[in-house]
């Protein structure tokens, strides 16, 4: 997958040089009439109809480029082979156990392609567990094999024609993808192309590339430079670009980054020009420019033509024209065309006027009105173009090297400048005296014997040296695949991590792989736990459990507190019982002592009486 840089501005230092279209190497001047003066042919300067009479080796080329809207990805699938197993075990005492298992195996390429072909007959059968076969005192396994296709579009690099994807073990060739598929880092999957469509990305399908015709010619400013021009690309220096292949086709990356193929490549375009192969340069695709050169130049040509027609209208109406009006008759494009020289004539108009305060006194028209109180003759000098001449000249662009706004004769690079010129005078106006100008062809003014001033500049101004401010969609591929070698200049970019579990959408095979990590024996009902309905049930169970747990803790606390109170009462009762027992024991002891004393008394009495009547005493004590 390529990295899209949605906002990338290419800003080059703009250095505009003034370029003037000067008539040189002119032929002889010939007088013409006013109605024979005509405007130069002004076409859209970037159109193919605008000709270069002085261009060398001029011809047309057909160049093409991919459509920006096209995709550089290939249609295909990630193919997986799965065994869905149902295991049923039944014991002799009729206890049944059912287990489900999904086993991932390495798929065969032929089986994957067959599965793709079956898509034309409808969607593939969704995998399912086979019905359980349970028998008494037996363990039965039922399994079904399925090929699972997951639509996935890897990136086809148009420079090396290799297929890149973060899931691939290594970049894959187109031939390998057709014969054995592209192996993934996960060996249980293989990427295969969609055999139902052409094995090429839309980006590289040149059947619907954008093609234009360009004019190829040598630059008038530098014979060692070749230029291409067309309304779509403007004026391009071919030798400032570099050669690069794209989708297996030869082409040129222009200085501004655009890549174009050369459909009818000619040796004249590349001989004697230093066009080298690109080294590490990636092409971009122009999406927007901040100026519409073609439309602007079209409007400019129309306006210049209107100004030229206005100048001719003034000439035909015998109106005064100035050097700016004269400059509109000159072409702004290099080539061969007419250059005009205007010669001035003057005449004096005499009027007889009377002063307002002279009354009925007759005026004298033979005397000057300023020396008479009655009025007199007024003289008015008029200046105008009296004759017109033209010559067939070569119009060549010349750069104002010292950038002083003037063209020096030395800047003409040895080309002959016409020595014909005329002195034009301007009438006094606003209290100022008139001026005398040394004017040559097309209203050019000699401010010094070797220095010219031109009112208008060539349309080449700013076109050859103007660098467009362009927004690109640039394709970079060095950091897409993690296993690729990163060059030193690419370290500033953060590698793109496109691991399946981070970037891709979750599908049912993802949970299958996660299940296999934790254990192979999984009940099918577990999957339902992750559904939205089961989540609500799960949270309800948790809430009820929390309430029951809280209530149980509260009851336990009350029971412990109650038991503590009963134990205190029991201890008090025991203490009372012990004190009563001690008192009873004390009383019993006293009674015993009393009985002992009484017995001792009787013993003593018996001993006293024993001497006289022993038999009677014995009978007493028996009772």
Swiss-Prot record:
GO terms for biological process: symbiont entry into host cell; virion attachment to host cell. Gene3D superfamilies: 2.30.29.130. Glycans are attached at residues 175, 264, 416, 438, 507. Pfam families: Rhabdo_glycop_CD (PF24833), Rhabdo_glycop_FD (PF00974). It is a single-pass type I membrane protein. Residues 555-623 are intravirion. One of its GO terms (cellular component) is virion membrane. The keyword Secreted does not apply. Keywords: Glycoprotein, Host-virus interaction, Membrane, Signal, Transmembrane, Transmembrane helix, Viral attachment to host cell, Viral envelope protein, Virion, Virus entry into host cell. The keyword Transmembrane helix applies. The chain crosses the membrane at residues 540-554. Coiled coil: none annotated. It is found in: Virion membrane. Residues 13-539 are virion surface. Residues 1-12 form the signal peptide. Homotrimer. Attaches the virus to host cellular receptors, inducing endocytosis of the virion. The acidic pH of the endosome induces conformational changes in the glycoprotein trimer which trigger fusion between the virus and the cell membrane. Belongs to the rhabdoviruses glycoprotein family. This is Glycoprotein. It comes from Bovine ephemeral fever virus (strain BB7721).
């Amino acid at each position: 997958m390529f990295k899209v840089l949605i906002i990338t501005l290419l800003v080059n230092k703009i250095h505009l040089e003034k370029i003037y279209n000067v008539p040189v190497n002119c032929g002889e001047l010939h007088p013409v009439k006013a109605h024979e003066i005509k405007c130069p042919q002004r076409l859209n300067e970037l159109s193919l109809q605008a000709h270069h009479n002085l261009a060398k080796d001029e011809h047309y080329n057909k160049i093409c480029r991919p459509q920006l809207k096209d995709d550089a990805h290939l249609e295909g699938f990630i193919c997986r082979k799965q065994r869905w197993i149902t295991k049923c075990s039944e014991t002799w005492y009729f206890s049944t156990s059912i287990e489900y298992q999904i086993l991932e195996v390495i798929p065969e390429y032929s089986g994957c392609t067959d599965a793709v072909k079956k898509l034309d007959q409808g969607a593939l059968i969704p995998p399912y567990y086979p019905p359980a076969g349970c028998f008494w005192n037996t363990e039965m396994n039922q399994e079904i094999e399925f090929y699972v296709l997951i639509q996935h579009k890897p990136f086809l690099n148009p420079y090396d024609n290799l297929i890149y994807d973060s899931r691939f073990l290594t970049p894959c060739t187109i031939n390998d993808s057709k014969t054995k598929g592209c192996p993934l880092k996960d060996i249980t999957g293989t990427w295969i192309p969609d055999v139902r469509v052409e094995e090429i990305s839309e980006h590289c399908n040149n059947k619907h590339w954008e093609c234009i015709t360009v004019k190829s010619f040598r630059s008038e400013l530098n014979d060692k430079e070749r230029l291409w021009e067309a309304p779509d690309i403007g004026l391009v220096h071919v030798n400032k670009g570099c050669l690069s292949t794209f989708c297996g086709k030869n082409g040129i990356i222009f200085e501004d980054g655009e890549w174009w193929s050369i459909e009818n490549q000619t040796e004249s375009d590349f001989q004697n020009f230093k066009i080298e192969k690109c080294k590490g340069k990636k092409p971009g695709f122009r999406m927007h420019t901040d100026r519409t050169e073609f439309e602007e130049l079209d409007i400019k040509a129309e306006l210049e033509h209107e100004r030229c027609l206005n100048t001719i209208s003034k000439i035909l109406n015998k109106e005064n024209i100035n050097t700016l009006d004269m400059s509109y008759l000159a072409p702004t494009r290099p080539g061969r065309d007419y250059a005009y020289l205007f010669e001035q004539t003057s005449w004096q108009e005499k009027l007889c006027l009377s002063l307002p305060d002279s009354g009925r006194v007759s005026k004298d028209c033979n005397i000057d009105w300023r020396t008479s109180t009655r009025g007199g003759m007024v003289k008015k000098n008029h200046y105008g173009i009296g004759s017109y001449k033209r010559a067939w000249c070569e119009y060549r662009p010349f750069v104002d090297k010292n950038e002083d706004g003037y063209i020096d004769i030395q800047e003409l690079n040895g080309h002959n400048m016409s020595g014909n010129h005329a002195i034009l005078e301007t009438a006094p106006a606003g209290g100022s005296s008139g001026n005398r100008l040394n004017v040559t062809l097309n209203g050019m003014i000699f401010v010094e014997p070797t220095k010219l001033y031109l009112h208008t500049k060539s349309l080449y101004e700013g076109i050859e040296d103007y660098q467009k401010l362009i927004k690109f969609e640039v394709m970079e591929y060095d950091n897409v695949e993690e296993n690729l070698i990163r060059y030193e200049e690419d370290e500033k970019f953060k590698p793109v991590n496109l691991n399946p579990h981070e970037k891709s959408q979750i599908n049912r095979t993802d949970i299958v792989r996660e299940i296999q990590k934790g254990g192979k024996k999984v009940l099918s009902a577990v999957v339902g736990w992750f559904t939205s309905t089961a989540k609500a049930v799960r949270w309800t169970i948790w809430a009820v459990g929390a309430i029951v747990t809280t209530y149980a803790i509260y009851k336990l606390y009350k029971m412990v507190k109650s038991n503590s109170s009963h134990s205190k009462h029991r201890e008090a009762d025991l203490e009372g019982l012990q004190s009563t027992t001690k008192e009873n024991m004390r009383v019993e002891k006293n009674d015993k002592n009393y009985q002992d004393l009484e017995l001792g008394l009787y013993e003593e009495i018996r001993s006293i009486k024993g001497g006289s009547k022993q038999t009677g005493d014995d009978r007493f004590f028996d009772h």
